[in-house]
């Protein structure tokens, strides 16, 4: 499978090579070398017949009619307000972006704070659940040990499963021995411990 993928990728590259040779013209950036080419042309030009035998020198004295046709406007008032408007718009856009970034940073800080609070609450809930299950386990283990001691204290009785006659039921039920009653009972009632069955979480 891996060899198959490699061969497909290699085949694609091999098929793309002819497309590069069929390109119409290569793209060359001559912006840096443009001045060097001009200098080389000056040196390569023939010295026998120069292009301009008599160079034309412009005279500073022009006729008035020709001078009126060429008006020079050096104020360029149309450029300045446009630049100012662009500067103002970019400044206002930048200010809006900065405000939005600050608002987003505040929201992120608030969300991080909420996340920390929720993580703390979750940790407390987990601790409460662990405490609840440990308490439940200790109660169950205490009740199972007390049930075992009660079963060990009972006398062994022979119970036959075959008949349900009243004689066998009387024999199967444990006998409670009561001593002579000389008055009120000497045993003190044990206090009742209130146990909450609600989930502490």
UniProtKB/Swiss-Prot annotation:
GO biological process: protein trimerization
Region of interest (Disordered), residue spans: 46-80, 143-201
Pfam families the UniProt entry points to: TolA_bind_tri (PF16331)
InterPro entries: YbgF_tri
Ranges of biased composition (kind: Polar residues): 64-78, 143-167
UniProt protein name: Uncharacterized protein in pal 3'region
